[in-house]
């Protein structure tokens, strides 16, 4: 997809090479965290030959929120995991069900069994004990921020002290990730 428009999109072609449809066109107006202005497909889970549905994960204007989608043969796309955070899926071979994994900056992974419409059938692992243990440390919560330079916007996250006072002075620990997918 990158060759067509510069972004990682999906396109469905017939066997003659004719473009049939753009898959999962999620473009929407609104504020874009970190300057990401387009949908970026991050993973393709598969194609259901019986229904013509394509299942995939994508970032839609916000690189901190990955969601799982299904694009139908008629071109309509539905979000199967609408909760903000990082969502992934492992689909059954018949695409009737999937195991959803969701987490965000302040919550460990939650694993759920869902149907192919995104309805949660049961929670498999909620990691409540880990969340409660972390809460017992009485720490502040993590939050994203955008750091802007004249040329770029970078996304970071910070943990402020529990009783943060905006006028106070605090020590800072800074770490920059420079590996694959980094913004450096």
Segments (PLM) and residue ranges:
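Serine-hydrolase catalytic core recognition
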Residues: 79, 88-184
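Residue position within the beta-strands of beta-propeller blades
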Residues: 1, 54-57, 98-101
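Short polar/acidic secondary-structure junctions
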Residues: 2-4, 59-61, 103, 163-165
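Short beta-strand segments and strand-loop junctions that repeat across beta-rich extracellular domains
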Residues: 70-71, 166
């Amino acid at each position: 997809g990158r060759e067509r428009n510069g972004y990682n999109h999906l396109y469905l072609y017939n066997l003659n090479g004719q473009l049939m449809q753009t898959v999962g066109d999620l473009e929407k107006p609104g504020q874009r965290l970190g300057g990401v202005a387009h949908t970026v497909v991050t993973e393709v889970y598969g194609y259901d030959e019986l229904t013509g549905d394509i299942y995939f994960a994508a970032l839609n204007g916000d690189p901190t929120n990955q969601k799982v989608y299904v694009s139908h043969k008629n071109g309509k796309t539905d979000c199967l995991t609408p909760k903000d955070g990082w969502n992934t899926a492992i689909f059954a071979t018949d695409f009737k069900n999937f195991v959803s994994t969701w987490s965000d900056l302040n919550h460990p992974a939650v694993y759920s069994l869902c149907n192919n419409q995104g309805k949660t059938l049961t929670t498999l692992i909620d990691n409540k004990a880990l969340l409660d243990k972390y809460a017992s440390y009485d720490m502040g919560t993590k939050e994203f921020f955008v750091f802007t330079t004249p040329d770029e916007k970078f996304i970071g996250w910070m943990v402020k002290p529990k009783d943060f006072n905006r006028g106070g002075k605090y020590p800072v620990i800074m770490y920059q990730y420079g590996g694959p997918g980094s913004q450096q």
